[in-house]
Amino acid sequence: MKTTDVVAWFGTKKAIAEACSEDGWKLTAAAVSQWGEEPPAGRQKQIAALTKGQLTAGSAPSQPETTPAQPSEGQQEMTDNRIEDLNIESIATLVTPTQLKEEMPISEQAVESVCKGRQAIRDILDRKDHRIFVVVGPCSIHDVDAAKDYAQRLRDLAEEVSDTLYLVMRVYFEKPRTTVGWKGLINDPYMNDTFKIQDGLHTARRLLIDLAELGLPLSTEALDPISPQYLQDLIAWSAIGARTTESQTHREMASGLSSAVGFKNGTDGSLTVATNALMSVANPHRFLGIDQSGQVSIVSTKGNPYAHVVLRGGGGKPNYDSVNVQIAEDALSKADLAQNIMIDCSHENSSKNPALQPLVMDNVSNQILEGNKSIIGLMVESNIKHGRQNIPANLDDLEYGLSVTDGCISWEETEDAIRKMREKLKDVLPGRTAG
């Protein structure tokens, strides 16, 4: 029996030390009785072996950083380490969604902001609101102060263009990686491979509350199927990325999200995975998840009627042009889906060159001027400064307001592009109707 198994039953190193004889960590009957209960029958042989000296002086386990789970009442066998969890190093208990929300309750002001944001986006998708909604902001959040700085600027711009464009701040905490790399603020908030996920959840929720209280509608990518229980109450629009659009887990999750959700086409440019996702997410599902108390549960959803496609390019080619938009319209029509199309101005639609994003925005404006009725939204990767930076070994060397993931356009470029779009579309959008 491994020393980790001893820890799993008797708790911490300290508890074992107090329960065992001083001459060599031999477990005795007193060690069992100290815990006030007899061990399960399946552990009798293991404890007997330990009392014969298999756990000797010098093999005392070091204090684990996490507390392994205790056996449930009535459990007859402990995990057989010959066949289970062979590649698991440790399992740590996490704050529950309820506990986090009790620590950081959402204010009435933030609730009002979320409700207004969700309704505005639903109205745009239903063609009750003539505006285009623009999800704009950093590729990922790594600096809370810079995010708040950006949000203040965006709020002012949002008010300026609100008659034509509905601006939604992009607040992405989770990053899918093609291979390896920094997975975002929730996974590694200190950017030093310490992976303090609980701290990441606290930081993310605190920031979302602060931004919602500014009156900004907020968006994020729903990547981890657990995190929405901690954060979704603050989100007005969600994205499912190109790498996960085909995932059954993410389709099921999206069917229960409270916000509208955009599904990107596949990384190869395929529309089929996105249209299949839209058909799936509109229907009820039952799947395994967690409830607000963190209990593993069977989740039954109603289906999400506000899912739509996001064209982001793929296979090394863009797909924002009028020809590809028409192809997407035809695919949606064939699948009997609403012709709601969002254009991602970044990724392969800009050849991963942030400087090309304003050109994509201008092209989309021209399509609408020429009569397009299916484009209802845009995504723009924008930050305070233009470009990107690698994460330095010394985090003090990070440049303020500069992305650490995908390259972004600067704030000045963002203002200019959005104002130009508003100027082009302000007269034509009020008369625009669904085709």
Task: State what each model feature region is.
Residues 1-19:
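Short basic helix-loop element that most often maps to the first helix and adjoining turn
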Residues 21-39:
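Recognition helix of helix-turn-helix/homeodomain-like DNA-binding domains
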Residues 39-58:
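DNA major-groove recognition helix of helix-turn-helix/homeodomain DNA-binding modules
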Residues 52-70:
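Short C-terminal boundary/hinge segments that cap the last helix of small helical domains
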Residues 79-83, 151, 164-320, 324-325, ...:
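Active-site-facing alpha/beta catalytic cores
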Residues 86-126:
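N- or domain-start disorder-to-order transition segments that initiate the globular core
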Residues 137, 343, 410:
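Conserved, mostly hydrophobic/aromatic
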Residues 369-435:
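Active-site or pore-adjacent capping/gating segments
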